[in-house]
Amino acid sequence: MCEQFREQADAVIDALYARIGEGSPQPRLAPTRRACELLGDPQRMHGIVHITGSNGKTSTARMIDSLLRAHGLRSGVMTSPHLNRLNERIVIDGEPISDEALVANYNDIEPFLVMVDTELAASDEPALTFFEALTVLAFACFADAPVDVAVLEVGMGGEWDSTNVANADVAVFTPIGMEHVEKLGPTLIDIARTKSGIIKPASRVVTSPQQAEVIEVLRGACELNEAPLSVLGRDIHLTAITPGVGGQLIDIEMHSGSYWGLAVPLLGTHQAENAAIAVAAVEQFLGGGEHRLEREVIEEGLAQSTSPGRLQVVRIQPTIIVDAAHNPHGAEALSRAVMSSFQFPSLVVVFGVLSDKDARGIVEALDPIADYFVVTQPHSERARPVEDLADTVTQLAGPDRTSWRGGLSDAIELAIEQAGPDGGVLITGSVAMVGEAMELLSEGEQ
C-alpha cells in the first residue's frame, strides 16, 4: 500500500514539475486566488503567519511552527525549497505531508487547476505555475487536516507571491538584502516594497534588524494598513547570547515581559535573532504582544525546532548528553540514537518530567540503555514531585538502579559519580530541565 502511494505521489510531483518552474514566477495573484475561490477559499479557514525576507525564512518558520505546536495548536507549514522530497514543503504537526495525503488532496484540487488553466489559456496567459499549484495544494492540505494556523514562507518577494492570497494575522520579516533584482527591482527599497506587500490591514508585523531604508518602507506599509510594527533591536531586545555546545542560551526582552535563559539548539547569532522574532511573532499571534507567554512552553517549542533525536554533548569525561525527549516516542528515538552513537561502559540517566507527561512510558523506553537512574525535578511549577516520580521509576527499574535528588545540580553531581570518567550521563525527560542543565553546565557549576 505504501509503495502504491509512493508511485502515485511521484506522479503528482511529476505533474507539478511539468508546470512553469518556480524560478520563473509570474507576478500575479489572480490565478491562485481564482483556484482558491473555486475550492471555497481554504486559506481563510485558519490563522496565518506569513514570512518573507532574504535569509532565515525557513529556520524562522520552523521555530514558529514548533512554538505554536508547543502551545497546543495544530499547525501547517509551507516552506521552500526542499532537501530530498517535495513532501517536505508541506508540513503538518511537524511532519512532512504523507504520500497518501498528498495524493488525496491533489486529486481533489486537480479538476479546479485544470479549470483555471483553461480560463488562463482563453486569455492568452500562462497556465498555473509549479509554485502557484503547489500553494493551492498546500492550502487544501491544511484545510483537510485541518490546522489551526498555517505558517507560510513566501516563494519570492511578497506582494505578488502566490502565498499572498492569504491574509496575514502576523507578518514576519527576516533580514532583507539584495536578491532577485530582475524580478523584485534594482534597489533595496524596491525589494523591500515588494516584500512589504504581505502586510495587510490589521496585520501585526515583526521584523529582524534591517537597514534604515528598509525600516522606512516597512513603517510606511504598516501605517497605511494600521498594522503595529515590532522591530528587533527597538521593541524586541536580545539582551544576552551565551554560546554552548550544540546551541546557545538567549535572553529576550519585549513589551510583554522577559524570557531569560532560553535554550536554542542552533548555532550562530543569526539563529538567536531568528528565535527572538519567532517568539515575538507567536506572542503577537496568540495575544497581540500584550501578554507574556509561559516560559516553559516557549522553551519546549524552541527545543523542538531541532531535528528529531538530536543529541547534544555538553561535556566530556564523563560525557554529558542532554536531550529534550519528553514523551515515549521521543524517548524511543533517543534510546536508539544513544545505542547507535555511543558505547559507554555505564550510562546514568538523570530524569525529571512535568506532571502532564507519561513518565512510565518514557522510563520504559530508556530502560534498555540505562544502567542507573537519578530522579530529580525540573525547576517548574508544572514539575512532577521528585519523590512521586522516584516511586514510579523504582517500580520499573528497581531500587538498586534508582536514586533521587531534589535539585538538578545535586542530581548531576551524583550521576557523574555513578558514571565514572569513562561513562556517560544522559539528562532527559523535560525540555525545561534540559535548558536548566545547559545553563548550569555552561556556568561551570558542575
Model-flagged regions — what are they?
Residues M78-P81, S208-P209, E223-P243, V264-T269, ...:
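Beta-strand->loop->alpha-helix junctions that form or flank phosphate-binding loops
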Residues Q211-L229, G246-L249, T319-V322, P328, ...:
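C-terminal helical cap/extension that packs against the catalytic core
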Residues M45, V149-L152, D161-V172, I176-H180, ...:
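Nucleotide phosphate-binding/pyrophosphate-handling subdomain across enzymes
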